[in-house]
């Protein structure tokens, strides 16, 4: 039990340091010092700094999936979520987006991980690809799957689902970025988020105007 607690303290300390300064700028000795152990003792828990990083990636992904399960968001299984979006109201949709937005900003591990990856995407092609998969591609694929199902059910306009996903997701990611850089603007960003969600909802549910004859 004590060994597991020390392992978690190492992960927490490393994530805090990586998110503030970047992976390459932090040494194993600094992580050990933050935990309150000697550097050689750290190697009893992890064979290398990269092993610590990989464990952070794995643990954060597991935490995110477990936490978002509670609000019916399963990014790894879009089919599971389609019923939750069927006949959803604008109010219910905004509440779902608001919850995930605030969770992304205020959960310490999730927020720190995103900040770490924001730094590291410019330092390593491998981590740049991981950033794109984690924060762009899988989110777009998830929402495109939702829109594809809603189009097939005749619930929203039959537009390209991949383009709809970009139109829907991009402002949300932009507002999270604003709050990461300027936390004092959170109230403003929440208001903008609500305006975006409600406008998008209205646009995809409205019938397109009939074409006029020349």
Feature-to-residue mapping (PLM):
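Helix-loop "lid/cap" segments that line or gate small-molecule binding pockets
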Residues: 83-84, 98-106, 114-122, 200-204
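Short, basic, alpha-helical segments at the C-terminal edge of helix-turn-helix-like DNA-binding modules
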Residues: 58-64, 71-72
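Hydrophobic/aromatic-rich alpha-helical bundle segments in the mid-to-C-terminal region
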Residues: 129, 133, 137, 147-199, ...
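N-terminal intrinsically disordered/low-complexity leader segments
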Residues: 1-5, 75-77, 208-214
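Hydrophobic alpha-helical connector segments
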Residues: 69-108, 165-168
């Amino acid at each position: 039990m004590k060994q597991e607690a020390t392992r978690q303290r190492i992960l927490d300390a490393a994530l805090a340091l990586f998110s503030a300064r970047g992976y390459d700028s932090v040494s194993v000795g600094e992580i050990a010092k933050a935990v309150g152990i000697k550097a050689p003792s750290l190697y009893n828990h992890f064979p290398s700094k990269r092993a610590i990083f990989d464990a952070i990636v794995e643990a954060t992904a597991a935490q995110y999936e477990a936490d978002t399960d509670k609000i019916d968001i399963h990014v790894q299984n879009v089919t599971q979520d389609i019923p939750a979006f069927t006949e959803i109201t604008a109010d219910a949709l905004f509440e779902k987006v608001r919850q995930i937005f605030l969770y992304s900003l205020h959960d310490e591990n999730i927020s720190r991980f995103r900040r770490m990856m924001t730094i590291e995407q410019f330092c390593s092609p491998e981590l740049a690809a991981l950033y794109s998969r984690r924060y762009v591609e899988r989110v777009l694929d998830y929402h495109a799957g939702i829109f594809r199902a809603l189009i097939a059910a005749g619930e929203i306009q039959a537009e390209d689902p991949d383009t709809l996903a970009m139109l829907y997701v991009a402002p949300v990611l932009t507002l999270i970025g604003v709050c990461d850089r300027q936390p004092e603007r959170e109230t403003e960003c929440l208001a903008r988020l609500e305006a975006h969600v409600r406008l998008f909802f209205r646009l995809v549910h409205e019938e397109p105007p009939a074409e006029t004859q020349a």
